[in-house]
């Protein structure tokens, strides 16, 4: 391994932070601490969300305890916009009234609170947004979303049921996303936008045991406009759905689960037509937002916060090449939450081992998939407790992203600092892990780091590893 010290140069040192930290600790205290103690020069500020991981305090305090700053009490977050939306931008969407009703933010606009004070200190402010915005498992979601008729804009699955996420083909919902971002870009002196897209594709959903969509009326119309036979695609997905349900129930297949899956897929190729249609419409949203930001303010950076499942899942890895993303992103932030990564891998593998890789032992499947994905980490039975090694995992993913973008976009590595754990045996974060992750980024040639997922759950003593590395 190349263990040399990274070159001394101007670095992008960002941190994802929720609005509540500025209320709990005070704007000046937070900014001075992050700049003077840690070395932060960019805030990735969550401005719109119904997810505690983006807008609240620690969502894993019951397991991890409270950090060494902030308010050590659960936050009864209701979610929404933590700035004052400009009504002129929302005349053509049902989501015009989405201002947060959290009492802590009554009369407070987080962008007006933070941006001027940050700029006085030479700190840039990017808005940080994640889709899905609502009821996202593992992200501390608000239990109730107080937006009338939102439930009617949901996806429809292949069984005809309203799904768990709004349909991004629904014109009113898609226009709201456009309007919400244009509002912030035009009306506030922000320095950039980071957008995260974490939707499961139809194949994703099938492998996880669900019934995929989107068969809502707007999505069907878009498919027909592209010459797609919607019903044939739905029937093909039903065949795959039946197979996945049988595999999960333990049915024995003469040729094994993997070969049987491939046979069903090849016999029903329309399922891949729907997968491709869904994927392109999903990417279209990213492309639209890039264009929107550039039309409003051509100099404003727009980047992608890239799901770690894209390097843990061979199907997603094939679907989301880095080179393509440089066509609609100025920077990418690969998520490499190293101490949490073993738990994430275990969950990802469990989906495959319930269905198409059911005949493989966990360590067999892990070793094979690691080889395919270019990962070199601990054996499966040690992985959750040890996490993934910064010197191999963070360095390797940074090098991979740099090769992929080929100089056409910046690479800011997403460094996990006290990312929420859901299992007591999951590796804990430490100052050393954080230090080695930052060092690994710069040794690989990365352009910067983004400490994530939320300052409200980070220990300052662990963030000291960033300062040590810098």
Task: List where the protein language model places each region.
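Active-site-adjacent "subsite" loops/lids of carbohydrate-active enzymes
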Residues: 8-23, 81-116, 126-188, 212-228, ...
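Aromatic-lined carbohydrate-recognition surfaces of secreted/lumenal glycan-active proteins
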Residues: 16, 123-136, 194-198, 229-254, ...
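An active-site-proximal structural segment forming one wall of the substrate-binding cleft
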Residues: 33-40, 114-117, 164-201, 240, ...
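Substrate-binding cleft of secreted/luminal carbohydrate-active enzymes
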Residues: 41-53, 328-347, 374-468
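Aromatic- and acidic-residue-enriched segments that line the glycan-binding/catalytic groove
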Residues: 53-80, 133-160, 196-262, 345-363
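Aromatic- and acid-rich polysaccharide-binding/catalytic face
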Residues: 196, 234-272, 319-386, 446-457
């Amino acid at each position: 391994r190349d263990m040399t010290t990274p070159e001394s140069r101007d670095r992008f040192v960002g941190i994802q932070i929720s609005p509540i930290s500025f209320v709990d600790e005070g704007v000046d205290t937070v900014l001075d601490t992050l700049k003077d103690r840690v070395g932060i020069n960019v805030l990735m500020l969550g401005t719109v969300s119904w997810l505690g991981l983006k807008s609240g305090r620690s969502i894993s305090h019951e397991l991890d305890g409270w950090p060494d700053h902030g308010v050590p009490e659960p936050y009864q977050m209701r979610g929404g916009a933590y700035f004052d939306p400009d009504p002129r931008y929302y005349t053509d969407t049902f989501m015009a009234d989405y201002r947060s009703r959290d009492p802590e933010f009554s009369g407070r606009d987080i962008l007006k609170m933070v941006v001027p004070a940050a700029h006085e200190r030479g700190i840039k402010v990017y808005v940080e947004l994640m889709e899905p915005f609502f009821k996202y498992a593992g992200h501390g979601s608000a239990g109730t979303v107080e937006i009338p008729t939102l439930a009617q804009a949901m996806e429809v699955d292949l069984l005809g049921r309203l799904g768990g996420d709004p349909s991004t083909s629904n014109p009113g919902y898609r226009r709201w996303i456009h309007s919400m971002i244009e509002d912030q870009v035009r009306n506030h002196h922000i320095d950039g936008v980071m957008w995260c897209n974490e939707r499961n594709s139809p194949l994703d959903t099938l492998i996880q045991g669900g019934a995929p969509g989107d068969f809502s009326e707007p999505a069907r119309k878009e498919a027909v406009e592209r010459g797609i036979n919607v019903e044939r695609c739905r029937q093909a997905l039903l065949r795959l759905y039946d197979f996945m349900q049988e595999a999960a129930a333990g049915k024995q297949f003469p040729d094994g689960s993997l070969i049987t899956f491939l046979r069903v897929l090849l016999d029903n190729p329309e399922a891949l037509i729907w997968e491709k249609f869904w994927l392109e419409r999903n990417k279209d949203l990213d492309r639209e937002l890039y264009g929107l930001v550039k039309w409003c303010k051509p100099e404003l950076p727009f980047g992608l916060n890239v799901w770690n499942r894209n390097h843990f899942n061979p199907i997603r890895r094939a679907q989301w090449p880095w080179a393509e993303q440089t066509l609609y992103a100025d920077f990418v932030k690969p998520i490499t939450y190293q101490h949490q990564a073993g738990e994430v891998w275990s969950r990802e593998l469990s989906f495959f081992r319930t269905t198409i890789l059911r005949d493989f032992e966990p360590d067999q499947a892990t070793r094979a998939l690691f080889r395919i994905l270019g990962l070199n980490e601990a054996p499966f039975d040690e992985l959750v407790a040890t996490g993934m090694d910064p010197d191999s995992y963070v360095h390797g993913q940074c090098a991979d992203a740099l090769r992929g973008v080929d100089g056409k976009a910046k690479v800011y590595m997403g460094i996990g600092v006290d990312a929420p754990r859901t299992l007591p045996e999951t590796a804990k974060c430490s100052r050393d892990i954080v230090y080695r992750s930052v060092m690994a980024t710069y040794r690989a040639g990365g352009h910067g780091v983004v400490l994530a997922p939320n300052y409200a759950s980070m220990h300052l003593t662990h963030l000291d590893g960033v300062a040590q590395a810098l």
